[in-house]
Amino acid sequence: MAIGGAEDKLGATRILRRFVAEAGGSDARIVVCATASALGPEIVELYERLFTRLGVAEVVSARPRDRREADKQEHADAAAWATGVFFTGGNQMKLSAAIRGTRFGDAVVAAYDRGVIVGGTSAGASVVSEHMVGYGSPGAQPKFRMVAAAQGLGLLPGVIVDQHFSQRERFGRLINLVASSPDLLGIGLDEDTSILVTDETDLEVIGKGSVFCVDMRTALTDAATARGTAPLMISGAGVHFLPNGARFDLASRTLVSYRDHSAVDPGDLPEPTHDLATISRRVASEGVDDSVVARNARRRRRTKAQHKESP
């Protein structure tokens, strides 16, 4: 399960609930890996409390800070014990560099191969694919040299995943990478939106936003010859915008079915506490691009100025 970040943690918690259900419900054994995050114990505590609120009896943390720690047997044993592994947000380059090819990373891959659900939000979503977005600039227009790729864990072959897709204007950088590697299917996840992949090719969309897919196997592009920061020429790309309830076949890259399941019963969850809400907001803002932060600050200043000018 790959989540676009900022998943609902205080309301119906539709995505996290589904993750718990796939992990075994009340019998689930969930390992939370917060290696990507700079928030440390705070983010571990958040997800431990969230999963406990959702009825999970056993939640443990595995947070190797580097490859040496990721090679410790205790972390590999945790992945072998789990019925669900969850990667938090943060920095996907930090996460991949720390765990890929280590005992812990290999144990997560082995767990996935035997049917354990592996999920991640934000940076944790990017790392599930073989090729992932390492870093890049926001913007709607695909340009040469606006993004760099890196290796992920390889749980989803043939795709490349980006997150916070609409909210952080990452259309251009995903298009850029797929134009350069047209055999890959580009998948952009909006916030509070996820994909659940079963049987290797059956993709289901869960959440309130959309999932953007781009297929360039038959498209025309000048990505191989572009120079500098020039805009790319792309013609004939296949695109899909998939909302909640859509099912998509990754092998044929076609829509299988669509049934809207927007209405969600929030169940009998207790009301979130103030500190839980505060931590959730801090987690949601982690990893925001500097340009987005600056733009939001300018917008707030303009709004304040307009209020002052109003009679």
What are these regions (language model features)?
Residues 1-26, 38-53, 133-134, 138-311:
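C-terminal and late-domain segments of enzyme folds
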Residues 31, 37-82, 87, 94:
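Portal/gating segments that form or line small-molecule/metal binding sites
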Residues 87-89, 108-132:
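Catalytic nucleophile loop
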Residues 92-102:
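Glycine/threonine-rich flexible loop motifs
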Residues 93-94, 125-128, 212:
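Short gly/pro/ser/thr-enriched loop/turn and capping motifs at secondary-structure boundaries
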